[in-house]
A protein has these predicted regions:
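Active-site acidic carboxylates
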Residues: 1-86, 103
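Glycine-centered short loops/turns at secondary-structure junctions
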Residues: 49-50, 109, 135
C-alpha cells in the first residue's frame, strides 16, 4: 500500500441501494459481494484517517430506482457516510462532471485515487478514464466493483468493426 504516502482519496461511486434490487434493469449481476468488500475497504480507510469521498448518482428520470425520491437512491448500509466525509451527487456517468470533484481534489492536494463502486462498465470505467486524463494516479481494488450483463447490442463491437482509415 505504497500509495498511502501519496495523500490518496478513496472514491466510493454509486454504492446505492438500487443495485441490491433483483429487478434492477441491467441484466444478471456479477460480484454480489462488491458492497461488502467496499465496506471493508472503507473501514480500513477510516482507521487510517485517510480522505473519503462518497459519490452518488441522482437520476433525472422520476421513474428510475436511482431518482432521489426513491429508496434506491440511499447509500448502501455497508458504506453509509459518517462525520465529515464528503458527499457529491452526480447526474451523469462520471464522478468528475458537474460535481466539482477535480477542484476539490486539487484543493486538498490529492493526486492519487482508489476507486470502488458501481458499475464497472459505466460510472467506474468513465470515472477512472477521466481521472487518468486529469493526471491522477488511479487504483482499482480487485472485487470492489460489479456490473451487469449487456442486454442488446454491444456497441463496443461497432468500434472494433469500423473500417480503418489511413491518411496518404
Amino acid at each position: 500500500m505504497d500509495f498511502i504516502n501519496k495523500n490518496p482519496a478513496l472514491l466510493l461511486i454509486d454504492i446505492q441501494k438500487a443495485f441490491l434490487d433483483k429487478d434492477y434493469p441491467g441484466g444478471k449481476r456479477n460480484n454480489h459481494n462488491a458492497e461488502l468488500i467496499c465496506g471493508k475497504i472503507l473501514e480500513k480507510w477510516r482507521e487510517l484517517g485517510l480522505n473519503v469521498i462518497h459519490v452518488r448518482h441522482s437520476s433525472t428520470n422520476p421513474n428510475s430506482k436511482l431518482h432521489e425520491s426513491k429508496p434506491g437512491f440511499e447509500f448502501n448500509d455497508y458504506v453509509k457516510p459518517k462525520g465529515n466525509e464528503m458527499i457529491l451527487t452526480k447526474h451523469v456517468n462520471s464522478a468528475f462532471i458537474g460535481t466539482g470533484l477535480d477542484g476539490i481534489l486539487k484543493s486538498f492536494n490529492i493526486n492519487t485515487l482508489v476507486i470502488v463502486g458501481m458499475t464497472t462498465n459505466h460510472c467506474i470505467s468513465t470515472s477512472v478514464r477521466m481521472a487518468g486524463n486529469l493526471g491522477y494516479e488511479t487504483f482499482l481494488i480487485n472485487d470492489s466493483t460489479a456490473c451487469y450483463n449487456t442486454i442488446g447490442l454491444d456497441l463496443s463491437l461497432i468500434h472494433i468493426s469500423e473500417p480503418t482509415r489511413q491518411a496518404s
